[in-house]
Amino acid sequence: NRRERYTLAQLNDMRGVFGTRPYRAPNDPCCVVAVQNFKGGVGKSTLAVHLAQYLAIRGYRVALVDCDSQASATTLFGYVPDLDLTEHDTLYPFLREGERSSLDYALRKTHFDGLELIPANLRLFNSEYELAARMAQGNGALLDRLKEGIESISDRFDVVVMDPPPALGAISLSVLRAAN
């Protein structure tokens, strides 16, 4: 069999050489997509992962943000969330501390060229209670914290896909506010 085989990285290199790799103009905003439904078990995580993979295969630079403490999207990339990851590998420190100015610390390369993941694990659920308690004290700006985080990494990506939890909680509301 004399068929040539190419990796996605090689295809993206060829797209770069021939000028066919999709890109967004520097003044165009990053597309932020939320695959959201308030019911569980309807395929949100599967759809979010497949959308992110499809866009990466097409040559786009994609970030997938797993905002769900069930961590289904994270699991689909080969992680055992509560064994392989700590809370410091997720959105949790960014949402909780307010000390971090960017989500760069949480980005992880995947086996898809052009696709990076911000993973989740069960400890991310703690942020639901913490955000709700702090918002009850009058700090409604916390709902925009995730949007600020997405903006901090948006210059590196064409598309950001978010996989929120199946509930109408603080994280879900933050995801809605961050999506465009």
How would you describe each model-predicted region?
Residues 2-179:
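P-loop NTP-binding core
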